[in-house]
């Protein structure tokens, strides 16, 4: 595979996104225009209310991940889910972290010591549930790198763990690398077209666009994916 060959020659710091590479200083960059296009979008605007929740997000993330908590990544996910609106509501999901009633009921029963009586409309409880669910999903669905692990976790958060596992199985059956998201598993699914687009866009937007924007604004945590313009 091109990705593995480049990894062997250039090392992991040069290879990360798109399954084909974002290479520093433009080395071989002309060969991978699609990768450059993914990272080239202007930084998204951060809602003015986001900094008001920063200490709460840092506290809740640290409860699960400790001092190295990926606060900027959690902030990026909240941004994608609800634009930081505690009363955000869609047809099937509610609150800042957009939990469906079924998932809210499940996670409250799964983690009663931390989420007993979980109210998805409460912003603190919503963020607490999000970080706990993210940790549960990423632990159960590891990938080749931290970037891949988080891509799998976010895909499962958005579309369900069952769909993620079917996608990985389909990728492996077609000879793709089932532990790599970008350029590999992301291309394999039996989901409806709209569901695939929504799910893949969700992962890409959080990891490649929103998380870097929150890092640039000073939110803490090491990036999951290396994004080189």
Regions found by a protein language model. Name each.
Residues 1-12:
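N-terminal secretory signal peptides that target proteins for export/translocation
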Residues 2, 17, 35-51, 55, ...:
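Non-catalytic cell-wall polysaccharide-engagement segments
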Residues 64-71, 79, 136:
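Generic signature of mature, soluble extracytoplasmic domains
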Residues 69-76, 94, 147-155:
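Alpha-helical scaffolds flanking conserved acidic
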Residues 79-103, 160, 206, 210:
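Cell-wall polysaccharide-cleaving catalytic domain and substrate-binding groove, primarily
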